[in-house]
Regions:
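A periodicity- and composition-biased signal for non-globular, repetitive helical segments
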Residues: 8-10, 41, 70, 127
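Amphipathic alpha-helical segments
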Residues: 35, 39-116
Length: 149
């Protein structure tokens, strides 16, 4: 269940960043600045905590993005109608192996966060991240609905 939720969250974040950039020409820097401000406020991070947290957080996000990029490149092979069962097996195994790698890596980053943040603040940061993602999806959906009218 956790893996499914995690995969959904990662896919949403990746889509949000990509869609936001295309729709509004929002740069990754601008997107991250908005995300940082929102998460800092909602989690109640001090300026010092933010200075320590976000470089690590964005480092993790970049690594996660690269791992997911690899998984999606392999997954695209599945669109070919001539894909064999063995190739589908490789696609599935690679995807879930990558998710395991991300989960292990995230645990390592949480250890780093614990050096300067309480568990409560770590929880609050992750909660804020989820809320930010939902809010962005809602905004993007509203923009898409307006364009269709």
């Amino acid at each position: 269940m956790k893996i499914r939720y995690f995969i959904t969250l990662v896919a949403c974040l990746f889509c949000i960043a990509t869609f936001a950039q295309k729709k509004n020409q929002t740069s990754e820097t601008e997107f991250r600045a908005k995300q940082q401000t929102y998460m800092s406020q909602k989690a109640g991070l001090t300026q010092e905590e933010s200075k320590q947290f976000f470089p690590l957080y964005f480092e993790f996000q970049d690594k996660k993005k690269e791992i997911n990029k690899e998984a999606w490149e392999i997954a695209k092979q599945g669109k070919n109608p001539d894909t064999t069962e063995a190739e589908y097996e490789k696609i599935i195994d690679t995807f879930f192996d990558n998710q395991e790698t991300i989960a292990k890596m995230e645990k390592e980053y949480i250890k780093k966060y614990r050096e300067f943040l309480s568990n409560k603040k770590i929880y609050m940061v992750y909660w804020a991240e989820r809320k930010f993602s939902r809010n962005m999806l809602k905004i993007l959906q509203e923009m898409d609905d307006k364009e269709k009218k």
